[in-house]
């Protein structure tokens, strides 16, 4: 929920939005400003004085009204200017790390009401967002673009390492030589890529209309990464149906960077004992990830195959007649599965 509020806050003030245009005009004029988004009862409790406007929002109106000392109150959707020149009187007992009066007031109002409050520094020419305990200072578009491009370059390197790790895992799965260490390494690399993705997403939200190219690059670089992670978990998790692959991946997402480097923690999340010696234990994949790579093979059929044969090794060694006996598989599909597995193995050996 907190993340959703942060996303909405960053998107609402991204370059190209009407609100950002108004903020930039105030910034250039060096008048400073204090803007509250929303007019709930909780927000109006801290508002005193000022005058009602209740007119459609426009960047020019926001700029003109900011010339007065008081705060400006906008509607929740930012489409109407409700009040101007209002005084904000939050509870002075609420702790604040800010020194300036405008920013201290903004922080306290945000903490007391959970509203998005925007403070524009007259002296430093900085736009700062407050919402609950969240605080974020907006940077110049050129600075964010530079950071985003650096993050994309890092993501490219991490994706290349992930692809090699997954290819090696695929090869080991065909040879039935996987250990828990191989599984942990693959899941670790998946999460590392997803963490960089989340960092770049924040830059994209903040860039708004300026972030289209970065967004396209990101989409290409993270294609199928989360799906691969979920399928690996399906292949190796010992946990019951109450612990879904999505739930396990979400758990790993909450870990610190240090915890993510601990392979024994990763295998413990899959339901194995957490000792270091367990990492050398051989394991056999159920076959979800490999079977998912065969074209036009429905999820229901993959599930029936795994339920019938138990693991990838048994599926690979099954005859066409045995495959044909599985629900949802006729002779044509049975041959397609055998041929698909053969091609995948040849491609893996060729790539390596």
From Swiss-Prot:
Gene3D superfamilies, sorted: 5' to 3' exonuclease, C-terminal subdomain (1.10.150.20), DNA integrity scanning linker region (1.20.1260.110), DNA integrity scanning protein, DisA, N-terminal domain (3.40.1700.10)
Needed co-factor(s): Mg(2+)
InterPro entries: DisA, DisA/LigA_HHH, DisA_sf, DNA_integrity_DisA_N_sf, DNA_integrity_scan_DisA_link, DNA_integrity_scan_DisA_N, DNA_integrity_scanning_protein, RuvA_2-like
EC number annotated for this UniProt entry: 2.7.7.85
Keywords: ATP-binding, DNA damage, DNA repair, DNA-binding, Magnesium, Nucleotide-binding, Nucleotidyltransferase, Transferase
Protein's GO biological process: DNA repair
Pfam family membership, one: DAC
Keyword Lyase: no
Binding site for ATP: 70, 88, 101-105
Molecular function per GO: adenylate cyclase activity; ATP binding; diadenylate cyclase activity; DNA binding
Domain named DAC: residues: 3-143
Reaction equation(s) it catalyzes: 2 ATP = 3',3'-c-di-AMP + 2 diphosphate
Family under the similarity heading: Belongs to the DisA family.
Job description of the protein: Participates in a DNA-damage check-point that is active prior to asymmetric division when DNA is damaged. DisA forms globular foci that rapidly scan along the chromosomes during sporulation, searching for lesions. When a lesion is present, DisA pauses at the lesion site. This triggers a cellular response that culminates in a temporary block in sporulation initiation. Also has diadenylate cyclase activity, catalyzing the condensation of 2 ATP molecules into cyclic di-AMP (c-di-AMP). c-di-AMP acts as a signaling molecule that couples DNA integrity with progression of sporulation. The rise in c-di-AMP level generated by DisA while scanning the chromosome, operates as a positive signal that advances sporulation; upon encountering a lesion, the DisA focus arrests at the damaged site and halts c-di-AMP synthesis.
Quaternary structure, from the entry: Homooctamer.
NCBIfam families assigned: PRK13482.1
Protein name: DNA integrity scanning protein DisA
UniProt source species: Carboxydothermus hydrogenoformans (strain ATCC BAA-161 / DSM 6008 / Z-2901)
